Amino acid sequence: IDMDKEALAPALGKLVSGLYIISLKHKDQEAGFLASWVQQAGFEPPMVSIAFNKERKAHFDLLTGGGKLVVNIMGKENGKTMSRFFKPAPETGSIFDELDTFTGITGVPILKDSVGYLEAEYFTEMETGDHLIVLAKVLGGALNSTEIEPSVHLRPDGFKY
């Protein structure tokens, strides 16, 4: 089947997503990245799916090594915090060092200024072309603010972030 990518791109970009910082920790190594393709994927047990770009192999390896993660739900006011994750990670220390964080049941950094968070553990993954889809079991979570609205993300071109 021939696909008309030019016609498909704007329609695909209208699939609504949010903006999230995924926190990872294994032993003393911490990492985080900005994600937009996160979705609830089950009620009992509660599950979430997260798309990992294959170029982020180091993050994926850290997750499968440690098994724990936090989905920080970012809000419209969190631009400064999110901008920290647009840059490469520092060569020493943690990407979270200059941010206000706390830890919950998983020991993975949680951003205090996020709308809320989900603590989860790796369950399985599936390869899907240029991304890996991780399914994670949610272990806990809470809102940090009832005042901040979650970010809603639409893309003009469904073939680009």
Indicate residue ranges for each PLM-predicted region.
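Basic, polyanion-binding surface patches
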Residues: I1-Y161
